[in-house]
Regions:
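Hydrophobic/aromatic beta-strand patches that form the interior of the parallel beta-sheet core
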Residues: 39-41, 53, 86, 117
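Histidine/acidic-residue-rich, glycine-tolerant segments that coordinate divalent metal ions
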Residues: 91-102, 108-160
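Histidine-rich, glycine-flanked metal-binding segment
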Residues: 1-2, 7-50
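Divalent metal-coordination and catalytic microenvironments
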Residues: 6, 21, 45, 56, ...
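Metal-associated gating/positioning segment near the N- to mid-region
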Residues: 46-110
Length: 160
C-alpha cells in the first residue's frame, strides 16, 4: 500500500510505503516501490505521525471492569494510534504484586491490540507505609506509582 499526499510532524510532504503490514519506506516519490496493482491511498494533506505511548491509563481490571476493561481500553488505544499503554494500579484489589501485573499483561496480550505495562503500587494496597513487596518485584515490572494517593511519608518514599 502506498500512502500519498500526507505531511509529517514538521508539515513537510511525505509518502509511506507499507509492505506486509509494516512501514517499508518513508519519503517522497515512492510510487516505484509500489508496483502497478498496489493500493494507493490519498491522505488529503493529513498529518502522518508515529505510534503513541500513553503513560497514564486507567483500564480498571480487576475490580472495576464496568468502568473500562482490557478489551475496551485496548480498542480505544488502538483506534487512537496508541501502540503501548501504562496502566495505573488503582484497581480492586490494588495492583501490588508481580503476579497481578502479569495476569493483566497476559490478558492484554490475548486481546493483542497494543502493548501493555501494568504498574505496581509503591506501598502495598496504597497503605502509605508498607514497601516490602517492592523487594520481590522482577525486572519485568517497569514502573511503580502511588497513582492519585502520593506517599505522604518522606522516609517511606526514600526507601522505596
Amino acid at each position: 500500500m502506498l500512502l500519498i499526499n500526507a505531511v509529517n510532524a514538521e508539515g513537510r510532504p511525505v509518502e509511506l510505503y507499507v509492505k506486509d503490514g509494516k512501514i517499508a519506506a518513508v519519503g517522497q516519490d515512492l510510487a516505484a516501490l509500489a508496483g502497478e496493482n498496489e493500493t494507493v491511498l490519498d491522505a488529503g494533506g493529513l498529518t502522518v505521525l508515529p505510534a503513541f505511548v500513553d503513560l497514564h491509563c486507567h483500564w480498571r481490571t480487576p475490580g472495576f471492569e464496568y468502568k473500562e476493561d482490557i478489551e475496551t481500553g485496548s480498542r480505544a488505544a488502538a483506534a487512537g494510534g496508541y501502540t503501548f499503554v501504562n496502566l495505573m494500579p488503582n484497581t480492586k484489589p490494588v495492583c501490588s504484586s508481580a503476579a497481578q501485573a502479569a495476569m493483566v499483561e497476559q490478558k492484554a496480550a490475548e486481546v493483542g491490540l497494543c502493548g501493555v505495562n501494568q504498574t505496581v503500587s509503591i506501598t502495598e494496597d496504597f497503605d502509605g507505609k508498607t514497601i516490602d513487596h517492592l523487594k520481590t518485584l522482577p525486572a519485568s515490572v517497569k514502573f511503580i506509582t502511588e497513582d492519585g494517593h502520593g506517599v505522604q511519608d518522606n522516609a517511606t518514599m526514600a526507601k522505596a
